[in-house]
Structures are given as C-alpha cells and as structure tokens.
Amino acid sequence: MQTPSLELKGSSFTLSVLHINSIDLEKVAKELDSKLAIAPQFFIGAPLVVNLSSISDSSYNLAALKDLLTSRQLVIVGITAAINTLSEQAKTLGLAIIKSGKQAQSQPQLPKTTKLVKQNVRSGQQIYAKNGDLVVIGTVGNGAEVIADGSIHIYGTLRGKAMAGASGDKHAVIIAKTMEAELVSIAGQYWLTDNIQANSTTKSGCIRLDGESLTIESLPL
C-alpha cells in the first residue's frame, strides 16, 4: 500500500500565553524588552498565543502589536479571548483564533514526568524539563538556566536562573537547598537577586506564587 503524502492527526503542544493588559504599546514594548533582557533564550523563537481578554477597545491596532512582537523574534501563532472586532483583525493578519478554557473541548492531561540531572549545570548550559518537573542534584552555576513546565528542585546551590511553570502552571514551585539565584520565575512572574534577598531570611527556600506575586518560605533544616 502506498504511503499517503500527508496525514492529519490530533496532537497537543505546550504554548506560552502572553497576556496584553494595556493598550499603550510603548509601555508594552518597554516591559517586554526588560523581560527579554533577563532571559532572551527562553522567549526568542518560542511560539506564543496572545491573550487579549483585557483589551476592550475595538480600535486597538492588532497589526502594530504583531509587528512589535515579531520584530523581537517572538513567534505569534494566534490570539485568544478577544472581542469580535479584534478577532476579525487577527484573521486578516493570518493569526489563528484559539479557544481556551470552557470554550475548548477538554483534553486528557498528559502524565507529568520528572527529569533528573545528577551533575552540576555550568555557565552557558540550559536544561529544560518539558511537561514535567526538574530535579538537579548539584549546583546551578552563574549564567546557567534551568527551565521546567512543572516545579524545579535544586539539591545544591542555585546561582543561575530558574524558570518554573514555563507553560503557565501557577502551582509550580522552585526549591533550592541554597538560594543565590540571578533570577527566579514562576508562570511569568519573576524576582531578581535583590528581590530574593529582601524577602528571605535563610539560605534555603521554597518560592511559589501567592495570587499574582511571588513569595518565599524557609525550608526546615
């Protein structure tokens, strides 16, 4: 039997969602550039869905927003939660209209896996645990990046960058035996070194989301 030249199959992919909360594109650009400066490898080239639930202005210039994002090497695959006029703009721009939450049919949740790294993560290295948690038995050095769609556990010193809940999981946590991170992020909310030091009284810690803000808790010795 001859193999068909194409096949259409169902599948699921993890996409990051960029929430636009302001109609001021200059403000959006400024805040976006600050995030890109912190972790460019994490954002650049990654497929994104733009959530427009906070935009109710029917005259909003979606084309200008698309140009702003693509000029920074962000890959926009579609929009979600937009009013009708913006959905029509999206169609003319070749963007998909993506349904989410109650609008979409429920998909079976993939089993969460754990990626185990039994060595130090050195400067310039990046480790990504897709659809699961990341456990590092060792030190994450300055200039190294550890990323997980789930939680991150460091049984050693965290000196580099740790980004948990990369696909939007707000229940993810970052735990480190010694917390000296350059940056920590959970579901897009981030702290730099100064924030960590200002909110922590011990070296070890568990960072999690409390509402829309990060918080750190001491670990029992």
From Swiss-Prot:
<protein>
    <recommendedName>
        <fullName>Probable septum site-determining protein MinC</fullName>
    </recommendedName>
</protein>
<dbReference type="GO" id="GO:1901891">
    <property type="term" value="P:regulation of cell septum assembly"/>
</dbReference>
<keyword id="KW-0717">Septation</keyword>
<dbReference type="InterPro" id="IPR013033">
    <property type="entry name" value="MinC"/>
</dbReference>
<dbReference type="InterPro" id="IPR036145">
    <property type="entry name" value="MinC_C_sf"/>
</dbReference>
<comment type="subunit">
    <text>Interacts with MinD and FtsZ.</text>
</comment>
<comment type="similarity">
    <text>Belongs to the MinC family.</text>
</comment>
<comment type="function">
    <text>Cell division inhibitor that blocks the formation of polar Z ring septums. Rapidly oscillates between the poles of the cell to destabilize FtsZ filaments that have formed before they mature into polar Z rings. Prevents FtsZ polymerization.</text>
</comment>
<dbReference type="InterPro" id="IPR007874">
    <property type="entry name" value="MinC_N"/>
</dbReference>
<dbReference type="InterPro" id="IPR016098">
    <property type="entry name" value="CAP/MinC_C"/>
</dbReference>
<keyword id="KW-0132">Cell division</keyword>
<dbReference type="GO" id="GO:0000902">
    <property type="term" value="P:cell morphogenesis"/>
</dbReference>
<dbReference type="GO" id="GO:0000917">
    <property type="term" value="P:division septum assembly"/>
</dbReference>
<dbReference type="Pfam" id="PF03775">
    <property type="entry name" value="MinC_C"/>
</dbReference>
<dbReference type="GO" id="GO:0051302">
    <property type="term" value="P:regulation of cell division"/>
</dbReference>
<dbReference type="Pfam" id="PF05209">
    <property type="entry name" value="MinC_N"/>
</dbReference>
<keyword id="KW-0131">Cell cycle</keyword>
<dbReference type="InterPro" id="IPR005526">
    <property type="entry name" value="Septum_form_inhib_MinC_C"/>
</dbReference>
